[in-house]
Amino acid sequence: MDYNRNEKVGLVRSRMQGEMKMDENVRIEGKQIVLRPITLEDTPLIVRWRSDPRVYGTLFRQEPITEERHRQWLREMVLSGKCDQFIIVDKAQNRPVGTVFLKEIDREHLRAEYAIFIGEETARGRGIGSEAARLMTDYGFQQLGLNRIYLYVFASNARAIASYRSAGFREEGRLRENYRCKDGNFADVLMMSILRSEWLEKRTAEQCVSGC
């Protein structure tokens, strides 16, 4: 993960001064993708993605959203500092393909919930989700100082589960028939997490493989 030094300093300074909102200038660069902070101008894009049944069918809110509902999310979650949300930009195509975020940021217990969706069909199955998960866990532990990042995923979503595992998330438990789907059936949900100690161990091992 590549943080511009000035951007990193600005982010840390803003938090030290008591500002809890995400620095709008931060950029996180990986091999395939760049993560940039979400803006109000992204609203039509988010609404288009969230209106696709192939997208919202994997989410816990299985319905399209309106622009007003998304703007409400930005006001109540992102601008309030409860959520740090990024747009995933595909470097090869130089276009947005999805969004990723840490929400319910708890600054007392140093934990947050991870979530992601890929909106563009051409970006699926290319490892972009796995890379986004790795970049966001780096961001959460390095920049936010978190101790734990957790997520919820449908037990039937094998592709997402494999992606989370590759980023270091471990299964904590299975919530049986925890979610009632639109068709009336109940679905099991997995809870997964990664701890700071596990992230450090994984990062050390990866650095050793590439540099030892």
Region locations from a protein language model:
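Conserved active-site tyrosine of GNAT-family acetyltransferases
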Residues: 164, 169, 192
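A short, well-structured alpha-helix characteristic of acyl/acetyltransferase catalytic modules
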Residues: 18-71, 198-212
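Short, Lys/Arg-enriched N-terminal segments with co-localized hydrophobic residues
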Residues: 8-21
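Glycine-rich acetyl-CoA-binding "A-motif" of GNAT/NAT acetyltransferases
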Residues: 94-98, 159, 186
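Conserved acetyl-CoA-binding loop-helix of GNAT-fold acetyltransferases
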Residues: 125-139, 162-166
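Conserved GNAT acetyl-CoA-binding A-motif
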Residues: 142-152
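Acetyl-CoA-dependent GNAT
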Residues: 65-122, 195-197, 208-211
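Conserved catalytic-core motifs of GNAT/GCN5-like acyltransferases
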Residues: 150-153, 170-187
